[in-house]
Amino acid sequence: MNLFTPLMLTAMFILLLPIIMSNTQLYKNSLYPHYVKTTISYAFIISMIPTMMFISSGQEAIISNWHWLSIQTLKLSLSFKMDYFSTIFIPVALFVTWSIMEFSMWYMHSDPYINRFFKYLLMFLITMMILVTANNLFQLFIGWEGVGIMSFLLIGWWYGRADANTAALQAILYNRIGDVGFIMAMAWFLTNSNAWDFQQIFITQHENLNIPLLGLLLAATGKSAQFGLHPWLPSAMEGPTPVSALLHSSTMVVAGVFLLIRFYPLMEQNKTMQTLTLCLGAITTLFTAICALTQNDIKKVVAFSTSSQLGLMIVTIGINQPYLAFLHICTHAFFKAMLFMCSGSIIHSLNDEQDIRKMGGLYKPMPFTTTSLIIGSLALTGMPFLTGFYSKDLIIETANTSYTNAWALLITLIATSLTAAYSTRIMFFVLLGQPRFNTLNLINENNTHLINSIKRLLIGSIFAGYLISYNIPPTTIPQMTMPYYLKLTALAVTIAGFILALELNLAAKNLKFMYPSNLFKFSNLLGYFPIVMHRLPSKMSLTMSQKSASMLLDMIWLENVLPKSISLFQMKMSTTVSNQKGLVKLYFLSFMITLALSLILLNSHE
């Protein structure tokens, strides 16, 4: 166990070498991406040793290196928490990043700033490591903000495109909302338990934890793109494909789920928060699965499937199974990163074409990418004995045992069948049928960087689930017998989704596409959410301020109150004065009659 700490720290601090090198001449060298990739591969190999040691001994460690400051009883120091979650997650993150870095060497080879791109990706990985291994809330917050800012920089990588800039801004703004919740939780823990260390927070008895846990749930909603704060994730697809593969599938977006997993000792006592988490996850997983059904951008379909899987992880936390949620995080990282890399390979080969309606018949020119995409899609749907099966099947089985939450299970099952449907749709549109793209495109996937990186993740997508699930601690549910129809539920709904998609595909091939239905519009326009949330408030505030400015100031004050009121007053007076017709005889006669009458009256009085 003596080597556990130094090896883990070596694996983490070795990643700083390429960042330090960025001030030297090596940073200007074209081999810099190669150095970064090699560093990450070495870090992965080193990190596997302490992980194996942890699996064999099961002994957690807390490494405190450097004390920073003390405020009353609050002690802030640089400390790393090496428990089950961090020791398993670090090799997974390093393995996936290693493959993505190698893929980036092929995908971004013509980019003039490729060295800076690799440095950004590496900085992102380091901040993710800080987040995962943090032992106190302050350190976790540094990692949390770090992944947020790196996400912003990498989504807006092609800053010449307006869409990329707005997408980056959208990501940072939605995450800001989540950060408010995080800071609120930090402040609550500081004032109530006077501690930011996880151990102290967990052992302190608290009366009512709803407020801090709500803050943490809001933070997770922002970072993990849950319903309400979800629109930034599909927009983030404006960034380069390696960014989508690393940040928006395998590592950064699971940070929110990871935060809730970290705080599971507080969550498991609080039924209110569990119910809220369950509701949020169930709504997200269904809504995003519905949205994925009709999208035409290949990356957006994969992005929505990511959001749907994140919803499934949140559901798992809601039924008080943090270890299962963590298992799904680890298994999901492999096949989702591979799906993004396959779509990146297709996009790059078809000269940056992302519309699946303009693809088709790619199984002949791109056999390796096709194989990987199909295996990745099957792993995503939870086909038996691929990686996704080990976590997804367990989650649905566990949910089956909770009869109180049957509605959440039902929604999750519908989302699972829809997962199979949109995966099949991608396979049909992209890989099978006749080519619908420009035949002049030079399709070539025989590049070692591309093949090796996808091959590694392909092996992970087949075997990783078995290896990780074999080492998961026993969950709170004891081994029990189960009727076979409950046991086969997950598989049954997945197969139903496949059959449904096959039927729909045949119908779509043979029938003419008429005017889109309202349901199609709802799915295609993302449930009208961006329109309502992004366009409507700004339009309403603009029209309201315009109306108040034009009506109140211009019309009422500057027109009616001062100039028009004076003119109206004078007009009334002048009309009264000048209301004479010029009939002199009549006036004279009336004057004479009045005079005569008054004289008669005066004389008669005398």
UniProtKB/Swiss-Prot annotation:
This protein's record includes keyword Ion transport: no
Membrane topology: Multi-pass membrane protein
Record's keyword terms, sorted: Electron transport, Membrane, Mitochondrion, Mitochondrion inner membrane, NAD, Respiratory chain, Translocase, Transmembrane, Transmembrane helix, Transport, Ubiquinone
An individual GO BP term: electron transport coupled proton transport
Main location: mitochondrion
Recorded catalytic activity of this chain's protein: a ubiquinone + NADH + 5 H(+)(in) = a ubiquinol + NAD(+) + 4 H(+)(out)
UniProt key word Metal-binding: no
Localisation per UniProt entry: Mitochondrion inner membrane
Pfam family, one: NADH5_C
Record-level Gene Ontology MF annotations: NADH dehydrogenase (ubiquinone) activity
Domain of life: Eukaryota
Regions crossing the membrane: 1-21, 43-63, 88-108, 117-137, 140-160, 171-191, 209-229, 241-261, 273-293, 310-330, 366-386, 413-433, 457-477, 488-508, 513-533, 582-602
EC number(s) per entry: 7.1.1.2
GO CC, any one term: mitochondrial inner membrane
InterPro entries the record matches: NADH_DH_su5_C (IPR010934), NADHpl_OxRdtase_5_subgr (IPR018393), ND/Mrp_TM (IPR001750), NU5C-like (IPR003945), Proton_antipo_N (IPR001516)
Function of the molecule: Core subunit of the mitochondrial membrane respiratory chain NADH dehydrogenase (Complex I) which catalyzes electron transfer from NADH through the respiratory chain, using ubiquinone as an electron acceptor. Essential for the catalytic activity and assembly of complex I.
Subunit structure and binding partners: Core subunit of respiratory chain NADH dehydrogenase (Complex I) which is composed of 45 different subunits.
Family label: Belongs to the complex I subunit 5 family.
Xref: NCBIfam families: NDH_I_L
Protein known as: NADH-ubiquinone oxidoreductase chain 5
Name of the gene this protein is made from: MT-ND5
